[in-house]
Design a protein with these regions (language model features):
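Generic N-terminal targeting/processing segments that precede catalytic cores or assembly contacts
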Residues: 34-40, 64-66, 97
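Short acidic, glycine/serine/threonine-rich loops at helix termini
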Residues: 1, 25-28, 42-44, 59-63, ...
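Alpha-helical interface subdomain recognition
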Residues: 7-12, 78, 106-197
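Single-stranded nucleic-acid-binding OB-fold domains
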Residues: 22, 65-69
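A glycine-rich, basic-preceded beta-loop-alpha segment at the flavin cofactor/substrate interface
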Residues: 54-57, 73-105, 122-140
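Flexible, glycine/threonine-enriched loop-and-boundary segments that flank and lead into catalytic domains
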Residues: 1-14, 18-29, 190-197
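Beta-sheet entry/capping signal
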Residues: 12-13, 29-31, 45-48, 74-77, ...
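A short core secondary-structure module
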Residues: 12, 16-58
Length: 197
């Protein structure tokens, strides 16, 4: 676990420790979750920090060899007295900030999954139409056709769930923005409550 201590002489936070499986670990800016409260052992002792690579103090110990998503390196990072700035309020790192980031990331991961599923289905369908067995395309065999039909049904269900969830998020965010400008009507408040779930 990464530990954060306040450096009063330099009026900044210092990060020490190791972080493993960090997405985009080679980025110039890091949002880092670290234990800022001495003697705590749960999420209430964690705060969010911003680290700038130009300030030094962090080494990439290793880059994971992954099966996919090579454009986003997953790294193991070693922080040695790395200068950082507090992001937001102390003790809300996990409870407020990370959970908000994770909820947004989940929708993106769902979209990636639907895209990968579509590509896999397209490949399987093309192969089943092209591959000949006993003088006909294997898609004409009931077992193969049923397999492809099941894949397509699950793909369509996943896409529908993604689109509906995205719609809910968009409506909730729109109502949230409107609420900052003016008071919501009772109907809008009810709708906001419905989409917040």
């Amino acid at each position: 676990m990464l530990k954060a201590t306040y450096d009063e002489a330099n009026n900044c936070w210092r990060l020490n420790g190791v972080k493993r499986f960090i997405t985009n670990g080679d980025a110039n800016l890091h949002l880092v979750l670290a234990r800022s409260e001495e003697g705590t052992h749960d999420g209430r002792g964690l705060s969010m920090f911003i680290y700038d690579k130009n300030d030094g103090g962090v080494d990439v110990r290793r880059i994971e060899n992954k099966l996919g998503i090579h454009g986003s390196p997953t790294c193991e990072l070693v922080y040695k007295n790395a200068k950082a700035e507090l992001c937001g309020e102390r003790k809300l790192g996990l409870i407020k900030y990370v959970m908000a980031l994770m909820n947004g990331a989940r929708l993106g991961i769902a979209a990636q999954s639907v895209g990968l599923s579509q590509a896999a289905y397209d490949e399987a369908l093309a192969y089943a139409k092209d591959r000949k067995q006993f003088g006909k395309a294997i898609i004409e065999f009931p077992a193969v056709y049923d397999m492809l039909a099941t894949i397509k049904a699950k793909l369509d269900a996943g896409r529908a769930l993604l689109y509906q969830t995205s719609r809910y998020v968009d409506i909730y965010k729109a109502l949230d923005d409107i609420a900052r400008e003016r008071k919501l009507t009772p109907e809008e408040r009810q709708e906001q409550k419905r989409y917040a779930k």
